[in-house]
UniProtKB/Swiss-Prot annotation:
Coiled-coil parts of chain: none
Region (Thiamine pyrophosphate binding): 478-558
Protein name, entry field: Probable acetolactate synthase 2, chloroplastic
Pathway: Amino-acid biosynthesis; L-isoleucine biosynthesis; L-isoleucine from 2-oxobutanoate: step 1/4; Amino-acid biosynthesis; L-valine biosynthesis; L-valine from pyruvate: step 1/4
Residues annotated as binding thiamine diphosphate: E132
Cellular compartment(s): Plastid, Chloroplast
CDD domains: TPP_AHAS, TPP_PYR_POX_like
Protein family membership: Belongs to the TPP enzyme family.
Binding residues for Mg(2+): D529, N556
GO cellular component: acetolactate synthase complex; chloroplast
Length: 663
């Protein structure tokens, strides 16, 4: 074991040369009655692994070279090199050494020592949210919009469990997140102590990795490993659970021990093989109707993707997570595909003879009936995570690699003089012309009814007023889909939304996190009345920090997406989807009154009910300094179209109708 450990340390050191190298041992609890075990951890694909199995499953969950930038180093405070300090102060200095500048938090008894230590940091800015779910979504918005890991701190028990939705969201959307939780003192673990929950057990399947620290000397290494794991390979959330007595214990930190991740690092994919890239170029040359299908795995490859499209002329469609990775107003953009994607994007994939899938999961909201998806096409799948290759759709060519490196390699091949003749054969003009006709035949549009405000129109006006430059966060529901269709996205990390988990309440805290990460940027939360209410308390944080977050609520007084399904598939039978005041009997009362609520938080707000009022109201919102809320009252009968029913195929696509019709 000693020899193996020494070898592991050597294998890790080169890969981690640019990272701080703390040390120590970590112990993890398996269950309440089992003895402590050294260095146990769990990952995306494990439940109760042994130590040996753990190192393997970590690597399968998160592989390849880093897809997010290594965090910029923050200046580290000057300290006496041998000075003893509390474990909590060691945690904070470890965060500083990992480049952390912002922490989103909500304090409690088991995490008090960490919060006290944070007040002593000259480097880290602390952002107090009003709910732990809000703080974790804010950390997610920070990470999604910047590429740097977001950090959140919560107490034990309900504080830790309130993080769970956000951890699951980050896990599904591959967002680099480090969550630090307080825990009951070690002697009380397993005794059902006050606010004790086994958060490590809770989060085994929704984190990339997690730790329970049982030795104060482990803190520097574990924090370092947490950031390395969160931001390399396929990014994801990492949880670090720290008992209160560990936070209080005095120790001299050691910053020079290597990380203990030999299994993970040894399985990081190498650069893509040249022969596989040659095969892809050959398939492109043989194709007549190719399509690029781009996901969130391309968020660090925007330039390379645009260059590849320049060289090949292949049309591009994106997933919900891929929005912004290719400019949506580019002539070769087909915008989003899938359940609520454009007709022409879905038509293109249905008729393609070659599908280049880059950084995607082939999830059900895109594929529908998976056997019918891209059934005429040869499929090339490039992804950083080997577990995704062939999981939902079997490719003809699979490449486990960082998409950025794969695109760089293919671009170099296409640019070589020897490939000039081949490039002349890449003439897809007839295919592009066919798709242009579909764009004209099936544009993204909407109907108007007098002075009622179409929600799509409100988003179009916002797009025009902001010139498509805003960072847009959303909740989940109809407004989310309309925001994909009617706003222009030209760059990666401009679009922030809960895609895989579909968590309502995401928009406002995520927008707050994005505003923290991008000072001076225009940040707008396009939200629904139902989704906003789930984390409306974060208006307090936005106001107190005077963040210039604009909130545009598309308020239809209903749970709109569920109402749409009720209209289409349940004979319009309403089952608890009306969110207004039942006593109003549809008498025009807007409930709750978001304008009054915003005023209670000290945030200026306005409401519009007529189409002719929208532009002036949006202009006023965007011109206002600091936060602002605009309540846009829209009809609940609107449907998000196009729509492919769940488990449907392109032939089942719906392009007309709304709640004013019967089905």
């Amino acid at each position: 074991m000693a020899a193996a450990a020494a070898a592991a340390s050597l294998s890790v050191s080169d890969a981690a040369a640019k990272l701080p190298k703390p040390g120590g041992q970590v112990q993890r609890r398996r269950d309440r009655d089992r003895p402590r075990v050294d260095a146990a951890a769990c990952t995306r694909d494990s439940r109760r692994p042994t130590r040996e199995r753990c190192s393997t499953t970590v690597s399968l969950a998160a592989t390849a070279t880093a897809t997010t930038a290594t965090p910029v180093r923050a200046p580290v405070r000057t300290r006496a090199p041998m000075g003893q300090r509390k474990g909590a102060d060691i945690v904070v200095e470890a965060l500083e050494r990992c480049g952390v500048r912002d922490v989103f938090e909500y304090p409690g008894g088991a995490s008090m020592e960490i919060h006290q230590a944070l007040t002593r940091s000259p480097v880290i800015r602390n952002h107090l949210l009003r709910h732990e779910q809000g703080e974790a979504f804010a950390a997610s918005g920070y990470a999604r919009s910047s590429g740097r890991p977001g950090v959140c701190v919560a107490t034990s028990g309900p504080g830790a469990t309130n993080l769970v939705s956000a951890l699951a969201d980050a896990h599904l959307d591959s967002v680099p997140l480090v969550a630090i939780t307080g825990q009951a003192p070690r002697r009380m673990i397993g005794t059902d102590a006050f606010q004790e929950t086994p958060i490590v057990e809770f989060t085994r399947s929704i984190t990339k990795h997690n730790y329970l620290i049982l030795d104060v000397d482990d803190i520097p290494r574990v924090i370092n490993e947490a950031f390395f794991l969160a931001s390399t390979g396929r990014p994801g959330p990492v949880l670090v659970d720290i008992p209160k007595d560990i936070q209080q214990q005095m120790a001299v930190p050691s910053w020079d021990a290597p990380m203990r991740l030999p299994g993970y690092i040894s399985r990081l994919p190498k650069p893509p093989a040249a022969n596989l890239l040659d095969e892809v170029i050959r398939l492109v040359g043989d194709a007549e109707r190719p399509v690029l299908y781009v996901g969130g795995g391309c968020s660090a490859s925007g330039y390379e993707l645009r260059r590849f499209v320049e060289l090949t002329g292949i049309p591009v469609t994106t997933t919900l997570m891929g929005i912004g990775n290719f400019p949506s107003d580019d002539p070769l953009s087909l915008r989003m595909l899938g359940m609520h994607g454009t007709v022409y994007a879905n038509y293109a994939v249905d008729n393609a003879d070659l599908l280049l899938a880059l950084g995607v999961r082939f999830d059900d909201r895109v594929t529908g009936k998976v056997e019918a998806f891209a059934s005429r096409a040869k499929i090339v799948h490039v992804d950083i995570d080997p577990s995704e290759l062939g999981k939902n759709k079997q490719p003809h060519v699979s490449i486990c690699a960082d998409v950025k490196l794969a695109l760089q390699g293919m671009n170099a091949m296409l640019e070589e003089q020897s490939a000039a003749a081949a490039r002349k054969n890449l003439d897809f003009s007839a295919w592009r012309s066919e798709l242009e006709k579909k764009k004209v035949e099936f544009p993204l549009g909407y109907r108007t009814f007098g002075e009622e405000i179409p929600p799509q129109y409100a988003i179009q006006v916002l797009d025009e007023v902001t010139n498509g430059e805003a960072i847009v966060a959303t909740g989940v529901g109809q407004h989310q889909m309309w925001a994909t269709q009617h706003y222009t996205y030209r760059r990666p990390r401009q679009w922030l939304s809960s895609a895989g988990l579909g968590a309502m309440g995401f928009g406002l805290p995520a927008a707050a996190g994005a505003a923290v990460a991008n000072p001076g940027a225009t940040v707008v939360d396009i939200d629904g009345d139902g989704s906003l209410l789930m984390n409306i308390q974060e208006l307090a944080m936005v106001r107190v920090e005077d963040l210039p977050v604009k909130v545009m609520v598309l308020n239809n007084q209903h749970l709109g997406m569920v109402v749409q399904w009720e209209d289409r598939f349940y004979d319009a039978n309403r089952a608890h989807t009306y969110l207004g005041n039942p006593a109003a009997n549809g008498g025009g009362e807007v409930y709750p009154d978001f304008v009054t609520i915003a005023g209670g938080f000290g945030i200026p707000a306005a409401r519009v009910t007529r189409k002719g009022e929208v532009r002036a109201a949006v202009e006023e919102m965007m011109a206002a300094p600091g936060p602002y809320l605009l309540d846009v009252v829209v009809p609940h009968q609107e449907h998000v179209l196009p729509m492919i029913p769940s488990n449907g195929a392109f032939k089942d696509i719906i392009v007309d109708g709304d709640g004013r019709s019967s089905y």
